[in-house]
A protein has these predicted regions:
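Electron-transfer interface patches adjacent to heme c in soluble/periplasmic c-type cytochromes
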Residues: 72-144, 149-165
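Post-cleavage N-terminal segment of exported redox proteins
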Residues: 1-36
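Electrostatic cytochrome c docking/interface patches
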Residues: 23-47, 58-69, 76-77
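Short pre-active-site segment immediately N-terminal to redox-active cysteine/selenocysteine motifs
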Residues: 41, 49-60, 108, 120
């Protein structure tokens, strides 16, 4: 689980500044290089995850205290990364009610606990980079990796608005 957490945060962090470019070939994605020893990068990824993903998506198989694996203290976790609980031993639950999310986005957002493990870091990297502006979609966004995705682009302010030609 420790490497999965690090892969997830690193892939998320690396996806932010990149443009939407995915290798063609049905499931063959650009290779992401992750340095699991770069704790500062992993900590930034954890902050991005809790600020942008945990609003809608739970990670119910992960407890906040596991963030100590990437060098954070209980105090840092409580002060900067916890918004729905005060106990660092609690699981990471979304702030948004799943029923409300289903009504607003067409489906309840999936739990993200095992996404990096089941899909792989390359998929996650491509997915986060794959959002593009699509005026035909209800929320104005689509994704080259997950067509007709119900999720709006959570990191567009960091990544910029991408277009598919």
């Amino acid at each position: 689980m420790k490497h999965t957490l690090k892969n997830w945060f690193a892939a998320l962090l690396l996806a932010v500044p990149m443009s939407a470019a995915v290798a063609s070939g049905g499931g063959h994605y650009e290779k992401v290089e992750i340095d699991l020893r770069d704790q500062v990068s992993l900590q930034r990824g954890a902050q991005i995850f809790t600020n942008y993903c945990l609003s809608c998506h739970s990670a119910s198989g992960m407890r906040f205290n596991r963030l100590k694996d990437i060098g954070l203290t209980d105090e840092e976790i409580k002060k900067n990364l916890m918004f729905t609980t005060d106990n660092v031993g609690d699981v990471m639950l979304a702030a948004m009610n799943p029923k409300d999310a289903a009504k607003w986005f067409g489906a309840a957002p999936p739990d993200l606990t095992l996404i990096a493990r089941s899909k792989g870091a390359d998929y996650l990297y491509a997915y986060m980079r794959g959002f593009y502006k699509d005026p035909t979609r209800p929320n104005g966004w689509n994704n080259v990796v997950f067509d007709k995705v119900g999720m709006p682009h959570p990191l567009w302010e960091q990544q910029g608005v991408q277009a598919v030609e």
